[in-house]
Structures are given as structure tokens and as C-alpha cells.
């Protein structure tokens, strides 16, 4: 018989895939002799089984759960559902990868109308007993039955107003009894006449099912897609004996880190609340005290906590994020995990752990999430602009960086206006965030909350995303329905600008200018270690000297893709290029190309100078010509005047360039076949620039000329012959013996299939995975967004094939092309220059496929360097 349930004493940290992160760590802590409320874990396999059986828990799994409850009753000397001294449990989810705020917790399960009376007598604390029951009704209704939390919050606010009190803790036992009656009425109404369940076994099974269901709720799916977590992992369920932090002033609950998760500084960092339950801190409902206050309130608990926290860090050799509860002076740990941290903190902690002798440089490189380096290059406020800024409030600096943008009050509005929507800069202002807000948080430049501490949902999720966040600004008076808030004597409505400093917690009026960040010395150490271990080269995709310098500063070893068409769009250039496009004879085109050639040459010279001898792959003209022709009336008239044509003639010529499917039309090398004079002009510009810079600066330059969109060997040979003829003519004129290479972009499936033939003519391959993905899947990058969401929801695809290389299809073409190309030309250099070149999982694939380098946008160069090192270490 399969084992679906494990006691904490039966597992260990290595059983993470089966027990989930939380369950495996609780088992490990039990083995370490830590004070853990005992319990058991229902495995991730049971979750998979639940989905396999049409969202039903099998009899076998249910029997094992009740058997484990029997053991827990024996262990605690209490009975589940007892009317005198009931066993109460918490039910928490725990996936293999940490998914903060994604899955929901239920506390005090096992209480009912009768048990609560016995519980009040047994504890001698009626207020505590009824508070525990009202919390359970609220959580069970919200998490299990999806009755909105706001219904209950509204009743609490009404009762507090009636009684003339401010805090929940000021409500008496009788007030809480009144709440319970009203809560159950809300439940009954929402559940269409069904009463709140009184049988603890029914409560438990419904809660377990709810955790399994929550694995597939929309916000969990979004989080998984954003963090590369496979959908088939499933979640475990942890059932744990309740301990109570809300029993009075010698009880409390808190969350703490062994190092600062924002900066990485060594030392306990955290918060706690006296007389509260765990979710109060994490959910950010009340704003807590710093952990140092615990030393004054409960000194013995504090010293025991400090000692055990260090024991955990030394055991796991990493910063720990711990949840704890103190029940009447006795300390319990509810969980520990490797803490989520900012990229800045990750680097600081990794370097410190190496210096402390706890880990090796190789382990340090593996500790840092490559994708998170994005955050390090976060903007900061311009110093002068900041001096003029008006501080209107200050709260907790929950996630670093600087952000300025328009105020929005809902996640929907943030999604509509922000990143991925209209692309405007928005700041999401909320009373408190909840997991439903995750997509809106992702679309925002910054997040500002009224409630919640440094460990609230908003803080943890924002740090993970690298989004600036300021939390717990109690000075704000917010009206979410009217979409306005008041702070510092000002009223702000939707669309007004504010600025946030997530490193100091300061809130400013207006739109303060931001500047790019500078990186610290420890960043250099990590990058030096990464460069030592990686096998893949890292280049950049850049078309301007400024981008090139930036990429070189961030460690790029050259340019893997210089898109020459971007050089034609300058205000003084585009009219000349349009003139060339609309010229109707070769002679006129050659004439029109002369000034354009000079522009290109000047640009290439500036690029070669910025590269200081590093290689550059120049891609010849790729987009269809219609992309360059004018669409505005004024531009059409100017072009007509310039060429001595009528407006109608210009419009007719532009119309003639129109294509039904331009991305598969007259573009790439097809332009060079039709208009060889364009390839000649570009060759002359590249060769003259390279020769002049190598002579002036003494750099050794070998131009790499890349012909795009080749699908046939003879097509490449035709363009190559044109290039060689012009290149040799330039060498002769300049009396130069400079060497150059001619290669191609592999972006048409046919080219990948015939790579052995194409390699007879090409000296290098660069995989243009954007087009290769479009043509292999048969859908357009610009239109796929309209239907891909349905594909994710239906679990047809787990990730966007344009962001994450499709290893099963497109990846096979890449592997085949590399292998077959090298059969023809063993020293064939192969790289990748699509957007995938900056994605860590795609980089690991490139390492395994035997590519020589990846090329990505300048700001992703550090990510690629680190990901390449991690791929080399993981696959050695």
C-alpha cells in the first residue's frame, strides 16, 4: 500500500519533493530536537492523486489522514472534537518551492459550538477561546469556502465602532460571541442555507481539499509561471498541533530572519506581536514590533530564540526565515526555510558565508538566483532631484529601489496601465496587498501599503520580484472605493504622481527623476567567481555606442548582434533611406545609398571604439522595406518634394511595398538578393570602419558579417559572393590585410535542417531564436499574447515560448543544426542572439547543446554570466 501521510518524525530535509519545503523542514527540525508542535504531512503525491481522481480524495488517503490524527491525539493526550479539551490543529500548504502568500492557512481547526465552551473552561480564558473560534470561522469560510474576507472584516469594524474600541484585542468574550453568531449567519447566507460544519473530521477533509485546490488557483498559476515552477509538482499539506500566541501578554507570534533580507547584514531581523496569532504578522493585518522588543518583554524566550535561530542557520548554512509562536512563555518554531531576499542581500550573504568558512565560492555562485540580478541594476533617485523633493511620509523600507509613477488603487488598474499594459509608470497603493494582487504588483514600478510590516505579503512578494515597496504607512487615510488617500496634508487621487524610496521608506510628493544604479564590490567578487566556472561566452545585443559601453561595463565579451536597421531611423537619416527605397533604378539606389553608407561607417567606428578590440557580429538589413516608408501625410509630402514626385506617386510606391505577411516576406537576405547594392554599401561601411579603427587605435579587429534569414545554401553563397567582392575591393583600396568572417543567422527551420550544407558557406552560426520560435510554432510573436493565456489556463503550455526557449521543438532544431554544422566545419562557432540569450533556463540548455556563447540585452549580461556558471557547475 502506498504511503500518503508521514509524521514529522519520519521525514528529513532531503524529502522535499515528497513532503514539500515546509514539511521537509519541519521533519528536519524535529530531528534536530527543536521545539516543534508535532504533526504530519499529506504528501505532494496525494495532491497529484487528488487531481487524477477528478478532485476527490481517495478512501485510502482519507484513512491514512484519520490514522495520523489518531496518533496525534495519543501524542497530545487530547481528542479531536472533544467537548472538554479538544485537539486543535492548523492546516497549511507547503509546495516543494516556496510560494509565499500563494496558498492559505487555516488555524484552530477542530472547534465547534460545543467544543468552544469546553475550551473556554479548560483554558480558564473565555475571551481567548471565542477569539480562536471566530478566527477559525473567518479563515475556514475564506480559504475553504471562498466567502470573501471583506464580509467578516466589515462586521468586525461595525462591532468595534459599536463598542467604541480601536483594536480587535479590546473586544470582550461577549463581543466575540456576538461576532461568532454574525459570522455564522454570513456563512449560511453565502452557502445558500448550509450551516457552518460542526464535525471536525468534515472540517479537516474540506481544509485538505482546499489546500490541494489552491495549487491550481489563478494566482498560484501566475506565480508558478513567473518563477519557473512546474505545474505537476503539486503541494503537500501540513497538519500541526495548534499552539496559541493569543493567550495573553506572555504569548505572541512572530517572523524573523537570521540576516537582513533587504541588505544581507548579519544579525536577527524580524517582528512579532504580543497576544496574536501567526497569520496576523504575515498577513500584515496589525503592524508589529521589532524583534529586539522581545528581549524586554520576554527575556528568557528571546535568548532561547536567538540560540536556536543560530543553530538553524549553522545547520542549513543559509539565512533562515522562521515563524515562531510563544504560548504562555513557551517558545515553539512553526517553520523555517531559506529566506527570500533581494539580490543585493543574496550577494552580501553569499560572500559573507564564504568569508565565514560556511560555504565555498562554487556554492556561493549557486546560491544566487540569476534572474534576481535584474534588481541590482535598479534605478535610484537622482541626488539633485531628491534634494528638491518633498517628503510627505515615512514607513517601512520593505523592498529596495526607487520608483515614481501614477497612483492606482487596484491590481486591475495597475495591469491595465503598467508594465505589460500601456507601459506607464504606476504605483499601486493598497490598504494591504493580498495574493490576488500579484499580477498588478508585477505591473507596478512600486507598491505602497497602509498596513503590514517588513514580513507582510506585500514586502515578501515585492522583494522576490525586485519591485520597490514601502509598507505599513499608518499615517495614510485611504478610501479605496473613492480612489483617494490623504498623506502629509495632501489628497491624492488616481493618476496623481508620487515617488517611493524602498531603501529608506520615504514617500515623496510628485514625480522624482531616477538614475541607474551602481553595483558594489561584492557583486564583482560573485561575477569573478562566475567567470571562472562558466564555459559559455557572454555577448550583448547592442546597436549604439552607449549600449555597448554599458554592456562592456557589465562584463559583455563582445557584441553578438548589432542590428544595422536601427541606425537608419535617425531624423536626418530616414529621409535618405526612404529615397533609396523608392528609387526605381540601380543607379539611383547606389546614389541614394552613398550618404547612408557614411552614416553606417561612422556608427560602426563608434561601436568598434567602444568595444576596444572585442568582437562584433553585424547583422545586415533584416526588416521588410515597408517598415521604413512614411505613414504620416507630412512625411509623405516631404519625401515627394525631395524626390520631385507627386504625393500620389509616393503613396502608390509605398502601397506597392505592402505585404500580406511581411514577417515571412521580402526581408533578410532576400533584400540582398534583390538589391545587392544594399549589401555592398553595408560591407563597405563595416570594412572601412574596422580598418580605420584598427589603424587609429591599434586594436585587432576581425569583422563578423552575418547574413540574416537564410534558408538555402545557394542563397547564402549569392550574398556572400557580393560581400567578398566588396570587402576585397575595400582591402585593396586601403592596402589592408584585415581578416573577416561571414556567417549566417539560423532562424528558418529549413536552415536548421540543412545546417550541414549551409556550413559549407558559413563560418559561424548565430541562432535567431525569436524568428526560429515564430516559424517553428507557426505563430507570430506580436499576436500570440492574444491566445497564449488560454493555453496556460488549459495547461497546453506552461511558459511563453518567446521568453523561455522551447527545448522539445525549437531546442531540437538548435541541437541538430550545431551537430550537423560541425560535421561539415568542426571549428564552427555557434551562438544564440534571440531574447532567450538572457533567460537562465534557456542558457542552461545552450550550455548543454554545446554553443560557444549567448548574447542578450546589456542589462541581462550579469544574469547570463551567472546563469552560464550555474549551468557549468550543475552539469559538470
Model regions: which residues?
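Short beta->alpha connector loops at strand-helix junctions that form conserved
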Residues: 40, 450-452, 471-474, 562, ...
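Glycine-rich phosphate/ribose-binding loops and adjacent secondary-structure elements
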Residues: 330-332, 434-442, 446-448, 454-461, ...
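Nucleotide/phosphate-binding sheet-loop regions of phosphoryl- and nucleotidyl-transfer enzymes
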Residues: 1-389, 415, 424-427, 434-439, ...
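Long, charged amphipathic helices and adjacent flexible linkers at domain junctions
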Residues: 66, 224-229, 365-420, 424-426, ...
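Conserved alpha/beta-domain cores
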Residues: 92, 519, 529-876
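C-terminal accessory/binding modules appended to enzymatic or scaffolding proteins
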Residues: 12-15, 399-443, 810-827
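Intrinsically disordered, low-complexity regulatory segments
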Residues: 475-476, 524-527, 543-545
Amino acid at each position: 500500500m502506498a504511503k500518503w501521510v508521514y509524521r514529522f518524525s519520519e521525514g528529513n530535509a532531503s524529502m522535499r519533493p515528497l513532503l514539500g519545503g515546509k514539511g521537509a523542514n519541519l521533519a528536519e527540525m524535529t530531528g534536530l530536537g527543536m521545539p516543534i508542535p508535532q504533526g504530519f504531512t499529506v504528501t505532494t503525491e496525494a495532491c497529484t492523486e487528488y487531481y487524477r481522481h477528478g478532485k476527490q480524495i481517495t478512501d485510502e488517503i482519507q484513512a491514512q489522514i484519520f490514522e495520523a490524527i489518531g496518533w496525534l491525539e495519543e501524542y497530545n493526550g487530547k481528542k479531536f472534537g472533544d467537548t472538554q479539551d479538544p485537539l486543535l490543529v492548523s492546516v497549511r500548504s507547503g509546495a516543494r518551492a516556496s510560494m509565499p502568500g500563494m496558498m492559505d492557512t487555516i488555524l484552530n481547526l477542530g472547534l465547534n459550538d460545543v467544543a468552544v465552551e469546553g475550551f473556554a473552561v479548560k483554558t480558564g480564558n473565555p475571551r481567548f477561546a471565542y477569539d480562536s473560534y471566530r478566527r477559525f470561522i473567518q479563515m475556514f469560510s475564506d480559504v475553504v469556502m471562498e466567502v470573501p474576507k471583506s464580509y467578516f472584516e466589515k462586521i468586525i469594524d461595525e462591532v468595534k465602532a459599536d463598542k467604541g474600541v480601536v483594536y480587535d484585542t479590546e473586544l470582550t468574550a461577549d463581543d466575540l460571541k456576538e461576532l461568532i453568531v454574525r459570522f455564522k449567519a454570513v456563512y449560511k447566507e453565502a452557502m445558500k442555507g448550509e450551516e457552518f460544519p460542526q464535525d471536525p473530521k468534515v472540517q479537516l477533509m474540506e481544509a485538505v481539499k482546499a489546500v490541494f485546490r489552491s495549487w491550481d488557483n489563478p494566482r498560484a498559476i501566475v506565480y508558478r509561471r513567473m518563477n519557473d515552477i512546474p505545474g505537476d509538482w503539486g503541494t503537500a499539506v501540513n497538519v500541526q498541533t495548534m499552539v496559541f500566541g493569543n493567550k495573553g501578554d506572555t504569548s505572541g507570534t512572530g517572523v524573523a530572519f537570521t540576516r537582513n533580507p533587504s541588505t544581507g547584514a548579519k544579525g536577527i531581523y524580524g517582528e512579532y506581536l504580543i497576544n496574536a496569532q501567526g497569520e496576523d504578522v504575515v498577513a500584515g493585518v496589525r503592524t508589529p514590533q521589532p524583534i529586539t522588543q522581545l528581549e524586554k518583554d520576554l527575556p528568557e524566550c528571546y535568548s532561547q530564540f536567538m540560540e536556536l535561530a543560530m543553530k538553524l542557520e549553522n545547520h542549513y548554512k543559509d539565512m533562515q526565515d522562521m515563524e515562531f509562536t510563544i504560548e504562555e512563555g513557551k517558545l515553539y518554531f512553526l517553520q523555517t526555510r531559506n529566506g527570500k531576499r533581494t539580490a543585493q542581500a543574496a550577494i552580501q550573504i553569499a560572500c559573507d558565508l564564504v568569508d565565514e568558512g560556511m560555504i565555498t565560492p562554487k556554492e556561493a555562485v549557486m546560491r544566487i538566483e540569476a534572474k534576481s540580478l535584474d534588481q541590482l541594476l535598479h534605478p535610484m533617485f537622482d541626488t539633485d532631484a531628491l534634494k528638491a523633493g518633498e517628503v510627505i511620509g515615512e514607513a517601512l523600507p520593505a523592498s529596495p529601489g526607487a520608483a515614481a509613477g501614477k497612483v492606482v488603487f487596484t491590481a486591475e488598474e495597475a495591469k491595465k496601465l503598467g508594465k505589460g499594459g500601456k507601459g506607464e509608470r504606476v504605483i499601486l497603493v493598497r490598504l494591504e496587498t493580498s495574493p490576488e494582487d500579484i499580477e498588478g504588483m508585477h505591473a507596478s514600478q512600486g507598491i505602497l501599503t497602509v498596513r503590514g510590516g517588513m514580513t507582510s505579503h506585500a514586502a515578501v512578494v515585492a522583494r522576490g520580484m525586485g519591485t520597490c515597496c514601502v509598507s505599513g504607512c499608518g499615517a495614510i487615510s485611504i478610501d479605496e472605493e473613492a480612489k483617494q488617500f490623504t498623506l502629509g496634508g495632501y489628497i491624492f487621487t488616481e493618476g496623481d504622481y508620487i515617488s517611493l524610496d524602498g531603501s529608506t521608506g520615504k514617500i515623496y510628493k510628485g514625480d522624482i527623476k531616477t538614475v541607474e544604479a551602481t553595483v558594489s564590490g561584492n557583486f564583482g567578487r560573485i561575477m569573478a567567481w562566475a567567470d571562472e566556472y562558466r564555459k559559455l561566452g557572454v555577448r550583448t545585443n547592442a546597436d549604439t555606442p552607449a549600449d555597448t559601453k554599458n554592456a562592456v561595463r557589465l562584463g559583455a565579451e563582445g557584441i553578438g548582434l548589432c542590428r544595422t536597421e536601427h541606425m537608419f531611423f535617425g531624423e536626418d537619416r530616414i529621409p535618405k533611406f526612404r529615397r533609396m527605397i523608392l528609387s526605381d533604378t540601380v543607379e539611383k539606389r547606389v546614389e541614394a545609398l552613398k550618404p547612408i553608407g557614411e552614416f553606417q561607417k561612422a556608427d560602426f567606428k563608434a561601436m568598434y571604439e567602444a568595444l576596444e578590440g572585442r568582437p562584433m557580429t553585424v547583422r545586415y538589413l533584416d526588416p521588410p522595406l515597408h517598415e521604413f516608408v512614411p505613414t504620416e501625410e507630412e512625411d509623405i509630402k516631404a519625401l515627394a518634394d525631395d524626390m520631385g514626385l507627386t504625393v500620389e506617386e509616393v503613396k502608390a510606391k509605398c502601397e506597392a511595398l505592402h505585404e500580406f505577411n511581411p514577417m515571412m516576406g521580402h526581408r533578410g537576405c532576400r533584400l540582398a538578393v534583390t538589391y545587392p547594392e544594399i549589401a555592398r554599401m553595408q560591407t563597405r561601411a563595416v570594412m572601412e570602419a574596422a580598418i580605420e579603427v584598427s589603424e587609429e587605435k591599434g586594436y585587432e579587429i576581425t569583422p563578423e558579417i552575418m547574413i540574416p534569414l537564410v534558408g538555402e545554401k545557394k542563397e547564402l553563397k549569392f550574398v556572400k559572393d557580393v560581400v567578398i567582392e566588396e570587402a576585397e575591393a575595400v582591402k585593396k583600396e586601403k592596402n589592408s590585410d584585415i581578416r573577416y568572417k561571414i556567417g549566417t543567422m539560423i532562424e528558418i527551420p529549413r536552415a536548421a535542417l540543412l545546417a550541414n550544407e549551409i556550413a559549407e558557406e558559413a563560418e559561424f552560426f548565430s541562432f535567431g531564436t525569436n524568428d526560429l520560435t515564430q516559424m517553428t510554432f507557426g505563430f507570430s510573436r506580436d499576436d500570440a499574447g492574444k491566445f497564449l493565456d488560454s493555453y496556460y489556463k488549459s495547461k497546453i503550455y506552461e511558459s511563453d515560448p518567446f521568453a523561455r526557449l522551447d527545448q522539445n521543438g525549437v531546442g531540437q532544431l538548435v541541437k541538430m543544426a550545431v551537430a550537423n554544422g560541425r560535421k561539415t566545419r568542426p571549428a564552427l562557432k555557434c551562438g544564440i542572439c534571440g531574447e532567450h540569450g538572457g533567460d537562465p533556463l534557456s542558457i542552461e540548455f545552450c550550455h548543454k547543446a554545446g554553443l560557444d556563447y549567448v548574447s542578450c540585452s546589456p542589462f541581462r549580461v550579469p544574469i547570463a554570466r551567472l546563469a552560464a556558471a550555474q549551468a557549468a557547475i550543475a552539469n559538470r
